[in-house]
Amino acid sequence: MKKSALLLVVLAVATSTLVSCGNASTAGSKPPSNLTERVLASQSVSSATASGGLVIIDGQYDTLGRGEVSAGTSPGLMAISADRATLLAFDSATDKVEVVNTTKETLTGGIQLPGSTMSMVVPQPDAGYAAVPSAPLTGTSPGAVVAMNLTSGGITATIGVPNAQTVVSNPSGTQLLVFSNDSDAVTVVSPALLNTASPVTLTVPLCTGCRPVNAVFSSDGSTAYVLNCGAECGGTQASVQILDMTTTPPTPGASVNVDGATIAFLSGSTLYVAGNSPTNSACTGETTAATVCGRLDLVNLNSMTVTGSAVITDGYHDRIDMGNGGQLFIGSMNCTNIGNVNNVAGEVRGCLSIYNTTNASVVIPPDNGDVTGFQSFNSRYVEYVAEGGNLRVYDLFTDALLPPNQYIETGTIIIPGYITDVKAIDFF
């Protein structure tokens, strides 16, 4: 595949119409559900006993709220603005992005994408972006980042980036990093340059065989820490590489080799990096029937050195979140599943790992299936985890399912259908 992207900007206007989005609920004005600590879970299966939509959950008691928000027939992946006023849900049945006003708990409209997406960002309440690898473009290879106007509705621009898989925004939404499969370069998109004579995109080559797939920005947006997938993605050595975002074009800097790098979480000067290594994949220290395991590496960004490593589940790691209390939740898809959580006889294992950042211990909970969503809370010591289509509630004091109480009996919020993603739409 080409290592540099042939870039094309195609301006377009979609036919969908939206109304302006409101703010997340506050103590002074309750939403229709009458809840002030709300969580939305995307339920993506429609059947005789369940209908696709966004289920409203009382995040204080882990109970179902009244009704749900309509968002197509198969909503899955969700993205939310920093102020939690606007939520996007991708309907895989129609390739449409459904836009939700979280204050009114209503669908305000939908934007038709030119294909499927697995990556969306909402850096500003009125602007969203989706990576669409199959987006058809005249005269160039398929693939684009679709810029969406979330206030007036429609597609603002289709920005050509061949095979665009993942889009990451800086904190202010002024720069986007776009990653394409089998590429050793990253594409930088500057949305403010749309409709100007200046190029909207820049291609920044990295090292041969790097295969960059993702990035984490510093809090001020001046630095991006690029995750080079390396051998796991058909390249050579996995690494974390600094990208100086204050220069034009951005300047690649120092790098540090890691076992694998597909997802990461930044905490202070430590970057927690998860992935798989083709040469360091033994499940050392674990009692398990699994023959292959992944790795979590701890990178000190001040010295650009690896200061620790832990054995975690295998699979493609694409979900990560820090719980309230220092537990790092790492999720993957297509991992080694062992046993049956619904008929326990011996070891049960799935795609979830919990790393304790205080004592460096790892817990592999007895569950099955892909991990597709996380949600932590500032006011509670629990973590919501969407795994295998179920919405689990983990107790952060025990790293196990929440014990029975008057609101929840099984550590699972029972919702008919298949739960794909989960997002808090209030601050709590």
Regions found by a protein language model. Give the residues of each.
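Sec-dependent bacterial lipoprotein signal peptides
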Residues: M1-S20
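Predominantly soluble domains enriched in secretory-pathway, periplasmic, or organellar proteins
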Residues: C21-F428
